[in-house]
């Protein structure tokens, strides 16, 4: 076993600066299935601040205490009532704060290698902690790791308490408070009165659920970066469109073609107004590209059924809509199925269209159907790659990950920990340069990763290829 790359300096408990007045918050049908998955582990890499690390640690402790006042559930614990319902008790029990050092590691060591280095996993607390343990462990931990020329701020938060949208709202607020912002505008909404709050009971074993994937399988993890121009080129190809000289889709030319296309005219009954640029999104195009490339790399027979699973935000899909700042999980996982033969024999548009139509169909009725299905059979979420042919997309390039300025710089990079990693787990991050650039954190078996790196259709869009 390799020696630890990170040395613990101190560990303490941080309490909210003000007492909470929130009542217990019942876990929803989106929260409860996450009791069997690891805590979310996400964090940001920064250059070294222009003041001593001891001053930074004091600042972050104070800022975290003040931030918890805006997010009381994170300082609480899970409690279960006699009927089996699980709640967050906003009891101000506190969160863990860890100060660690790895002063032999430089920023270039974190972001300069092809694969994500193993030592990045040590920048996060609560390694392999399962969300059910929130009954007797803090729901949040923050670790600040001092590097030779930088600092990594890593968070681990219980996945039955937050989804990605709620997590990044917390992290952004933590950064705002640290840099002296007095008025927090994006106040979380703790309302619990939607269809997601159910009377169904999730029955669990007395010692809690276990993760549903092998945590010790050999894996490779790599960040693939896609510039805005590459993504626009990919989107245009997916939609059978042309780009103009600025790299934008030539809308005028496309609309003229559609005006004279009998098929488009015949489809008028289905859609009166056609927005050509919105048919297949940039992100769906990128997902289709990855689906095809990984399917090729896995060398399946054409009859093998593959699955591409996407998480969708339900906040704006429900009627009435949830507040965009609703705090908790408001996501559902959509599986899209296609045989390996169909994925590879059809073009990019066909693959992206399968993703597009399933996401579009996930409206208020479908969200409620998913809720009713879960209520008939309450269960934990089966996270993993059970037949070797699955891809699971998480996170989102829309999350404001690079808005986290704690007072001296924006992040140099965003990284995640070991949590919930298995063959076929993909996470989407915004690129640091912004403007629609995207980073894909791809976790695959070593042999599949090798095949992906040799896939010319995929790699032609990757930055630096």
At which residue positions do the language-model features occur?
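Soluble acyl-CoA-dependent acyltransferase catalytic core bearing the H(X)4D motif
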Residues: 2-22, 36-37, 41-73, 77-401
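Short, surface-exposed beta-strand/loop micro-motifs that present aromatic residues
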Residues: 33, 139-145, 423-431
């Amino acid at each position: 076993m390799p020696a630890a790359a990170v040395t613990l300096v101190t560990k303490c408990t941080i309490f909210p600066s003000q007492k909470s007045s929130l009542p217990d918050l019942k876990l929803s049908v989106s929260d409860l299935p996450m009791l069997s998955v690891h805590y979310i582990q996400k964090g940001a890499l920064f250059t070294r601040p222009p003041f001593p690390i001891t001053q930074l640690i004091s600042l972050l402790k104070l800022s975290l205490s003040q931030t918890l006042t805006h997010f009381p559930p994170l300082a609480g614990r899970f409690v279960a009532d006699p009927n089996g319902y699980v709640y967050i008790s906003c009891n101000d029990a506190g969160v863990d704060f860890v100060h660690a050092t790895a002063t032999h590691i430089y920023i270039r060591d974190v972001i300069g290698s092809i694969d994500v280095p193993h030592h990045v996993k040590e920048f996060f607390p609560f390694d392999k902690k399962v969300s059910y343990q929130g009954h007797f462990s803090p729901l949040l931990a923050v670790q600040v790791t001092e590097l030779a020329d930088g600092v990594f701020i890593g968070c681990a938060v219980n996945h039955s308490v937050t989804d990605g949208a709620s997590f990044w709202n917390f992290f952004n607020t933590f950064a705002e408070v640290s840099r002296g912002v007095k008025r927090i505008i994006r106040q979380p909404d703790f309302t619990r009165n939607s269809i997601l709050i159910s009377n169904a009971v999730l029955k669990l074993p007395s010692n809690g659920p276990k993760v549903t994937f092998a945590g010790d399988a050999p894996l490779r993890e790599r960040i693939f970066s896609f510039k805005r121009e590459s993504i626009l080129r990919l989107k245009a190809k997916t939609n059978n469109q042309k780009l103009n000289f600025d790299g934008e889709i030539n809308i005028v030319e496309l609309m003229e073609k559609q005006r004279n296309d009998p098929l488009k005219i015949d489809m008028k009954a289905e859609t009166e107004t056609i927005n050509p640029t919105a048919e297949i999104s940039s992100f769906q195009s990128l997902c289709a590209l990855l689906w095809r490339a990984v399917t090729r790399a896995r060398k399946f027979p054409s009859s093998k059924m593959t699955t591409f699973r996407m998480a969708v935000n339900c906040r704006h899909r429900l009627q009435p809509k949830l507040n965009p700042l609703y705090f908790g999980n408001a996501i559902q996982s959509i599986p899209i199925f296609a045989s390996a033969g169909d994925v590879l024999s059809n073009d990019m548009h066909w693959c992206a269209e399968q993703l597009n139509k399933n996401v579009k169909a996930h409206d208020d009725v479908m969200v409620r159907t998913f809720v009713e299905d879960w209520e008939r059979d309450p269960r934990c979420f089966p996270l993993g790659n059970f037949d070797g042919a699955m891809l699971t997309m998480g996170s989102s390039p829309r999350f404001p990950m690079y808005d986290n300025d704690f007072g001296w710089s924006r992040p140099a990079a965003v990284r995640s920990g070991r949590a919930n990693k298995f063959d076929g787990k993909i996470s989407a991050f915004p690129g640091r340069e912004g403007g629609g650039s995207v980073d894909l954190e791809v976790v695959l078996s070593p042999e599949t990763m090798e095949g992906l790196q040799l896939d010319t259709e995929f790699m032609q869009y990757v930055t630096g290829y």
